[in-house]
Amino acid sequence: MHINEFAGLLIPSGTPYDPRFNESDGAMTMAKWQRAAAAAVIALAAISTAVASHAAAEAASGPAGKPVNKPTGAPIQLALIEGMSGPFANAGAAVERNLRFGVEQVNAQGGVKLADGTHPFELVVLDSKGSTEEALVQLRAAADRHIGYIMQGNSSAVAAALIGAIDKQNSREPGNRELFLNYSADDPALTNADCSFWHFRFDAHAGMRMDALGDVIQRDKSVKKVYLLNQDYSFGHDVSSLARSTLATKRPDITVVGDEFHAIGRVKDFAPYIAKIRASGADAVITGNWGNDLTLLVKAAREQGLDTKFYTFYGNSLGAPAALGDAGVKHVIAVADWHPNAGGAPSDAWYAAFRARFPQAQDDYPVLRMPLMIETLAAAMNRAGSADPTAVAKALEGIKFDNGFHASWMRAEDHQLIQPLYVMEMDKAGTPGVKFDNEGSGYGFRTVLALPAERTVPPTVCRMKRP
């Protein structure tokens, strides 16, 4: 697996966004943040212009340095099919913000350059209500509107259903084809045994994430017993099996003392699960939980005083740090393609621009791969000189994209994006390596392991059928 005015920002006291926060402690005052954000927008514009110019040159477009004009062609619609209501509405809203940010960045740079002129992107949001059946209904609605680009990611089960339907759609109606852009559905099968020419994944799959977590667990000798707790659907089962195989390879001395699944989106009180974890004597929990299933889990752990480490896929997001508070300090580890404290001026500038666009504390969940997906799509269209899904799919294969601080490339063999990964540890904002906090909580994450893209390349068994 979740606005525009600083004057409207609700600022929790004692956080880096609090005007009273001591700047000497290493965090940012509000005045300093506003100045930095304004400067960062200018810096990000320069970075984006350079990237856009490079992509345009690659596609034999107009000369670099020419003033950017507003795109005048018909909008190219991108359909987001996601749960915008229901138990994971917060995750859906976070996705929409990140994708909208990417769309706005592309449009601000003149849109995409096709043979008939420049075209803006337009984000069309379709609510799947967290249901596979409703997602398929919305997919049909998108096809009826001849929307050629489908984006989804907050469920691997939904993603698999959409890919199957798109495969059939594209075979039956070659004049109305659709391309599926996946930003978070992390079931490894989607770029392995079940790979499809019409599917591109822009997130590291569960195996890639678990391998990175495994590198950190390997050197954490305090961990002797591990409890596996995951959501009861394809992704959760993948996390469980991958955790077992990774531990067997990297830490065969660790004992798995529990391996449990719970209904996705239905558990309101995780106290019984916390009691089981405590009784097992586990030193650490490995979980792929996301959204409210993660927030409620870590909240229960805090309330029950559970003193174990949480090795998570998404522990840095959507309310989890605030729910844990001090109990999470040096106890919660997460893995992601990027995080605000990754460091470096270009990274800081991008983050400041995102916060300037979405300054509310609860909106502080930037997911770099989502805007990056939009920008990479634009670069592929520029390369193809077309918005036809088939031509764009071919242009996406092997494409390299560098926004100035996060270089990535799309492997043609299985349509898996290869990019850096970061493993991070929760701590208080203002401590070394934690310049920024998450969602105004006063807690953020520091990098404990940074893997360059070449260290994250997974094997694949994909045997793709091409049109």
For the regions a language model picked out, list residue spans one by one.
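Periplasmic-binding protein-like
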Residues: A142-S156, E173-Y183, Y227-N230, G281-G291, ...
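Solvent-exposed, acidic/polar segments of extracytosolic/periplasmic ligand-binding ectodomains
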Residues: E58-G65, I76, K400, G404-P467
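Extracellular/periplasmic Venus flytrap/periplasmic-binding protein
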Residues: E134-V137, H146, P188-A189, S196-G305, ...
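Signal peptide-proximal N-terminal region
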Residues: V68-G73, R97-L123, A248-D253
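Extracytoplasmic "Venus flytrap"
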Residues: G62-G102, D127-T132, S155, L229-D238, ...
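Short, low-complexity disordered leader/linker segments with a strong preference
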Residues: M1-Q77, D144, K465-P467
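Beta-alpha junction/loop-to-helix N-cap segments that form part of ligand/metal-binding clefts
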Residues: P63-P67, N90-R97, V112-N192, F202, ...
